[in-house]
């Protein structure tokens, strides 16, 4: 699409316009669906950027054209979906590709369960398409807004020790590389590329096609029970995580209580009538817009009076689950799986999630709770937390989301199915702890509460042998990650180097965590580096604007 048919491109540098126009004359009219003046913002409003071009291709040939043009124009390419990662991984001042219009189901084999889809399809769209065909994904996380490529690329997971990462059912991928070529990879064909692409972090190319094994559609009967954290810890090594196929917990540190969600597969069909008997959970007036805004405004108030934060936890917990002590089953339902897994994330938030060995969960939560509550010897629930940072005057939001999985059930290094950058345990079940700090009305908590909380939280996670979730907030360094992942880290880097030697898909986030520390004489030719950042006013969405600059080394 030349600039004559797309006047918005007239604002581009003349050399870039000429490259696009020349390519449009020679490629048989393959569209280049690009626009300028797009503002990219993460879902949480934590980061924004102003890409030079925002491009929404609708076919593999269009994606290949984007990559070829970027190579000739000496531009970095970043891919984004819903922007649910609160980090700056998708921020760019160069070319931003969104695959929302590349979202079709290509084929479904009901005999094998193999489904082939275009990589831009969102998980909610995919779930609906599968349901219409009597199929489902084996497991989902708490949200379904991500594209399937984004969920794969960042290691999205659900919660249940019979399941691992959402990407565990992937059997084949197609990816468009920096040279414009689209390759297939699988455990048998180009296994190193496959293992690298399963958690690619957007640094290898653009995933275009995903083949995975679906399962017959299923419904879940779930219930939610309230218990003290002491009893949760007592049940931990008994049947806490094996009592149902899917289990997740929300822990409230100030109240020292938890909501335990359990779900099992059921057949909701009435044998007499043949009717499907789904049942929605009971609701109250507080579950409406009233509760949403009451909680939001209480969080906003706590920015100015942080000491009321534990009271807010008590009030919101009571309104949702009841104010009585002891175990109380509050709600239950029977829903289609793609609906039962979902959780309302409510408001803008920072999230910091780490994966540790499952058996270390009670120790982690007890030590974290003792630190947050400033417990002293003799206080109920006191343990020596060992965290070398003060929590005096620190008040944090709740809950801490607690989930578990076991990626060893379906994946292994030997079978070439375990991602190189899989943060889960390679020898047993994994526990995920997700520390949330809300940003009411897109404003950060005061008194550096988020930074202080995450400083202590990450110190504890490191001590317990943890690794951070790639899509969330963390402060580990490249050296830390290289040490934790060992040979797999080096092998992932070798694949990246082989498929993108000029760094077309490399930005500041990748340099920070995956590449050697920045040295001017060792920049990749197409790498984008961070030039500066600036705060965005809350009335404009808040967060930090990331401004990058290309290395722009001419090709040899």
Curated annotation (Swiss-Prot):
Record GO cellular component, one term: mitochondrion
Annotated Pfam families: ALO, FAD_binding_4
GO molecular-function terms, A-Z: D-arabinono-1,4-lactone oxidase activity; FAD binding; myosin V binding
Keyword rRNA-binding: no
UniProt KW keywords: FAD, Flavoprotein, Membrane, Mitochondrion, Oxidoreductase
Any single biological process term in GO: mitochondrion inheritance
Broad enzyme group: oxidoreductase
Annotated metabolic or biological route of this protein: Cofactor biosynthesis; D-erythroascorbate biosynthesis; dehydro-D-arabinono-1,4-lactone from D-arabinose: step 2/2
Cofactor: FAD
Xref: InterPro entries: ALO_C, FAD-bd_PCMH, FAD-bd_PCMH-like_sf, FAD-bd_PCMH_sub1, FAD-bd_PCMH_sub2, FAD_lactone_oxidase-like, Oxid_FAD_bind_N, Oxy_OxRdtase_FAD_BS
Catalytic activity of the protein: D-arabinono-1,4-lactone + O2 = dehydro-D-arabinono-1,4-lactone + H2O2 + H(+)
UniProt-annotated location(s): Mitochondrion membrane
Residue ranges constituting the FAD-binding PCMH-type domain according to the UniProt record: 47-217
Top-rank taxon: Eukaryota
EC id: 1.1.3.37
Coiled-coil positions: none
Protein family: Belongs to the oxygen-dependent FAD-linked oxidoreductase family.
Protein name as catalogued: Putative D-arabinono-1,4-lactone oxidase
Source species: Neurospora crassa (strain ATCC 24698 / 74-OR23-1A / CBS 708.71 / DSM 1257 / FGSC 987)
């Amino acid at each position: 699409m030349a600039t004559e048919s797309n006047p918005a491109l007239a604002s581009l540098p003349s050399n870039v316009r000429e490259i696009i126009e020349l390519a449009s004359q020679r490629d048989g009219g393959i569209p280049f669906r690009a626009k300028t003046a797009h503002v990219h913002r993460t879902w949480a409003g934590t980061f924004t950027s102003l890409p030079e071009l925002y491009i929404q291709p609708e076919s593999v040939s269009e994606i290949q054209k984007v990559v070829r043009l970027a190579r000739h124009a000496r531009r970095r390419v970043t891919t984004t979906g819903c922007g649910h990662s609160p980090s700056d991984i998708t921020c760019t001042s160069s070319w931003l590709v969104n695959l929302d219009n590349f979202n079709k189901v290509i084929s479904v084999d009901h005999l094998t369960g193999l489904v082939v889809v275009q990589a831009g399809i969102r998980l909610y769209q995919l779930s609906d398409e599968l349901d219409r065909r009597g199929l489902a994904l084996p497991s989902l996380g708490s949200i379904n807004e991500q594209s399937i490529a984004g969920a794969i690329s960042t290691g999205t997971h659900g919660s249940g020790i019979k399941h691992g990462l959402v990407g565990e059912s992937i059997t084949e991928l197609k990816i468009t590389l920096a040279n414009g070529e689209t390759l297939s990879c699988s455990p048998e064909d180009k296994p190193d590329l496959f293992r690298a692409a399963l958690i690619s972090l957007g640094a290898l190319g653009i995933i275009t096609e995903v083949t995975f094994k679906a399962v017959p559609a299923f419904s879940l009967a779930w219930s939610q029970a309230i218990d003290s954290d002491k009893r949760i810890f007592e049940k931990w090594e008994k049947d806490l995580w094996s009592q149902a196929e899917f289990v997740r917990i929300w822990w409230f540190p100030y109240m020292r209580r938890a909501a335990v969600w359990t779900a099992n597969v059921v057949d909701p069909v009435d044998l007499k009538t043949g009717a499907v008997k789904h049942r929605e959970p009971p609701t109250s007036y507080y579950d409406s817009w009233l509760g949403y805004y009451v909680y939001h405004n209480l969080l906003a108030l706590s920015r100015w009076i942080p000491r009321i934060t534990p009271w807010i936890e008590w009030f919101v917990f009571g309104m949702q689950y009841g104010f009585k002590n002891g175990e109380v089953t509050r709600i239950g339902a029977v829903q289609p799986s793609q609906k039962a897994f979902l959780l309302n994330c409510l408001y803008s938030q920072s999230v910091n999630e780490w994966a540790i060995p499952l058996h270390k969960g009670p120790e982690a939560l007890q030590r974290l709770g003792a630190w947050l509550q400033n417990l002293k010897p003799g206080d109920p629930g006191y343990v020596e937390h060992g965290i070398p940072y003060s929590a005096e005057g620190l008040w944090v939001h709740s809950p801490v989301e607690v989930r578990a999985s076991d990626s060893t059930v379906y994946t292994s290094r030997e079978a070439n199915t375990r991602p190189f950058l899989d943060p889960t345990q390679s020898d047993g079940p994994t526990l995920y702890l997700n520390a949330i700090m809300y940003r009411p009305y897109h404003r950060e908590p005061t008194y550096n509460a988020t930074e202080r909380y995450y400083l202590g939280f990450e110190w504890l996670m490191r001590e317990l042998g943890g690794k951070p979730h790639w899509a969330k907030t963390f402060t580990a360094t490249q050296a830390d990650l290289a040490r934790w992942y060992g040979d797999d880290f080096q092998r992932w880097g070798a694949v990246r180097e082989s498929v993108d030697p000029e760094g077309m898909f490399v930005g500041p986030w990748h340099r920070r965590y995956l590449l050697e520390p920045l040295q001017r004489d060792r920049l990749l030719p197409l790498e984008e580096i961070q030039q500066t950042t600036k705060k965005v006013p809350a009335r404009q969405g808040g967060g930090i604007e990331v401004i990058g600059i290309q290395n722009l080394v001419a090709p040899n």
